[in-house]
Structures are given as C-alpha cells and as structure tokens.
C-alpha cells in the first residue's frame, strides 16, 4: 500500500538543497532524558541527515547534558523557560516551528508527548504528519503499521518538511558516546489557550512497562483483580513488569496504565509472558515485536498461540504457582 502526499505550493524561501537537517524533539521530565529519544535518534540516523535535538522545559540543564552525549548529535538546542515546564503543545509547537526553520525533518517518539505535539506542528507548517513509522526506506519514504499491525503501509511524502512520530520499539537505542555542543534558544511562547492543572504519576517498585526486559501480562482469564497476585509472585522472581490486556483493564482487574496494546503501551521486551490472554488483534499490535513470547492459555485455539514462540495449554491457576515455586 503506497500513499503519496502532494503538498500545496507554498511561497517559502526554504532551500532544501542546503537545509537537510533533522530536528529531534526530546522526550524528558525536566530531569532525565527518556530512552525513547535514543530510539528516535536511531531512526533519524537512518534518514542520514545532520541531527540536532531540541529540549523544551524548565530547569532542564541535566537533560541537555544527557542529550549532548547521544552519539550522532551535532547540536543540542535548549529552550528553558517556565512556559515550557509541562511541555504543553500550545507553547511548544510554535517554538518548534521557529527553531526548525532550517530543518527538513522533525521527529519525535510516538509517546503521549509526541502524539500530542506533532499534529499541531504539522498543522502550523501546513504539511501532513506521518505517524508511528517502523522503517525508513529513504528520505521521502517510510513504513508504518496499519490495521492494528496486520498490514504495513509504505508512505511517501513530497512535503518540504517531514513531521514524523517514531515507534520506538522498532529502532534500537543510540549510543551515548557523543559530545555535542549546547546552545540556548531564547524564544518564549506564552499562551492562555491551556493551563496545566495537575498530574498523578503511578509509583511502582517494578520496572516501567515500556522499559522492562521481562513482562508478564494477564488477561480476562485471570477472572478477577485479586488473582493478579499470582502474576506478581512470578514477576518478583523474574524482576519483571506486569501488564494486562484491554479486556482485563476494562473489567476493572487492574488500572489502565497496565494496558499493553494498540490503545495501551507498545512494548518489545526480551521476554513477554501472556497469561490468560486470548490474543485480540489490538493486544498483539502492542507486543508482537517482543523477542521471545510465551503463552499460557487453556484454550488451544487461542490466537495468541499463533505469535507465541512457546505455548502451554494449561490451567493458569495450576501453572503459575508451580512456575513461581520452580523459580
């Protein structure tokens, strides 16, 4: 499937022959550079252009220092002001369009921050946004999943600026052996369209889902939330994160930040253990890139077995205690 975007004629003085730089928008919390940015830089390297990182935040000097060490980065641009503290797109989007006047590519990780920001940037630039790419074929052509990952679309854009979100699980993390220069951007875009109210972060002793090397997830087959303690005991032995299918979340077994899938978190751990999960398309889209998939389900016809490297047809309430004891 090929989709060709034909941009409108614009009276821009941008000369693409001379300006072929990629701007990566950093994903961070004002203290640490998130690993998703490293995956995005790897995608930018496949485009093959000079790469710069933009950090918009408040008191984010440590983030800039982290970004400067990312291999392949020529420059880190820092916009440090209270109006960027919570990275509201109404403030950050005009900042990006100002900074990116000499850039041909604008990339961000397909996280909540990137998905919230890049559509607004694309609208301000009057170009199409390309979402969730998993492969770079050349500077104009990219591959992205469609139909919950059951098909891949090859998307070609002739827009003068490509605005792209990157599926981070499809690219490895860039190394941190660089020594880029750090520059300040003094642009301030205060706005009154939106106001930050509050945020509540989930705290857990376990690894964060998108960064975990081992994940054990439960589905509707767990029957109720109390039975997730069986997963917790195994997770404690493995040092694993705990996930869930949408069915388990919708049933109220666990909070929605456990959800793995197309409408949840996209993960690609070294080991993914699916327990009592039938394997709906939406769930498979979120975990099928895992290096090793183990499925435990009493229904031998469950779709999850079609993607599993190892499958066990058994009663999870018998298997999990035995597994926990064996570990």
Question: What do these predicted regions represent?
Answer:
Residues 3-327:
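N-terminal glycine-rich FAD/FM-binding segment characteristic of electron-transfer flavoproteins
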